[in-house]
């Protein structure tokens, strides 16, 4: 009986070109493979997923379902993001630099966070914590005073006090003010701990993006300060002689 199935049909059926982003493909044996690009863009390493699974079953007695992680893809993606911004900065003669941060709510597993920090170190990638547990995790994972830590989410007294303790210890930690009450806490604990804070504000933009999150943008956004509230922040900082402490603007289009 003539075989009608082909590798190209498999690629089309599983739509690999749309989601694989050149990291995934199908080899001549019909198995899914993982391509790890080198610095020249060509495949540096190729892994046959079926061979890996078969080896784990035979040698380690680990059976599906199983989760395979390819750290080299993470490393390549961080480099790719950095290079895209670096090229744009050079093209448009921008006088500053790009510095990304990884929101650990995406994946809080320790080895993932550690790899983000390791692979992102040449680019000074930082972390974003969106809750008290994430803040504690982040402070434990970051072992130097140069990696930026951005703090978002709901902030009570304990959260702000912890942030400013870390600041006093020399950490490069920046809380993002999303409500006026958070600014009052920053002022309160900076005086109590005798530390000069650095913080940002999250702004509600009047403009909207498009797509799934369009309805969450603009002044209807749940989080952030209106322009009127931002002006109030500036007035308070002027009264407290703390204008230089505001060094960051955070916003979402949706």
What residues fall within each predicted segment?
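Active-site-proximal beta-alpha core segment in soluble small-molecule metabolic enzymes
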Residues: 95-254
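A general structural signal for short secondary-structure junctions and capping/turn motifs
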Residues: 13-16, 22-25, 55-59, 140-142, ...
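Short, well-ordered helical secondary-structure segments
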Residues: 6, 11-13, 55, 61, ...
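Short secondary-structure boundary micro-motifs
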Residues: 6-9, 15-17, 49-50, 56-57, ...
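N-terminal basic/disordered segments at the start of proteins
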Residues: 1-40
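Low-complexity, highly charged intrinsically disordered N-terminal segments
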Residues: 27-110
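Homeobox/homeodomain signature
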Residues: 14-16, 22, 42-43, 213-215, ...
């Amino acid at each position: 009986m003539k075989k009608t199935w082909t590798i190209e049909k498999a690629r089309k059926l599983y739509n690999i070109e749309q989601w694989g982003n050149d990291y995934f493909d199908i080899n001549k044996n019909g198995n899914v493979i993982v391509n790890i690009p080198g610095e020249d863009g060509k495949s540096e390493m190729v892994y046959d997923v079926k061979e890996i699974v078969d080896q784990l079953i035979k040698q380690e007695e680990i059976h599906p379902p199983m989760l395979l992680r390819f750290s080299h893809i993470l490393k390549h993606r961080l480099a790719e993001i950095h290079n895209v911004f670096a090229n744009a900065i050079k093209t448009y003669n921008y006088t500053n630099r790009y510095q990304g941060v990884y929101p650990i709510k995406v994946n809080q597993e320790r080895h993932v966070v550690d790899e983000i920090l390791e692979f992102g170190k040449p680019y000074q990638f930082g972390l974003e914590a969106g809750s008290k547990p994430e803040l504690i995790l982040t402070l434990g994972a970051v072992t130097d005073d140069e990696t930026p830590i951005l703090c978002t989410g709901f902030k009570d007294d304990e959260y702000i006090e912890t942030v400013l303790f870390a600041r006093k210890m020399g950490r490069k930690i920046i809380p993002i003010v999303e409500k006026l009450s958070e600014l009052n806490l920053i002022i309160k604990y900076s005086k109590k701990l005798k530390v000069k804070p650095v913080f940002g504000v999250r702004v509600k933009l009047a403009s909207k993006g498009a797509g799934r999150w369009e309805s969450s943008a603009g002044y209807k956004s749940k989080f952030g300060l209106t322009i009127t509230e931002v002006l109030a922040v500036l007035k308070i900082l002027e009264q407290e002689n703390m204008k230089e402490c505001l060094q960051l603007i955070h916003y979402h289009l949706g």
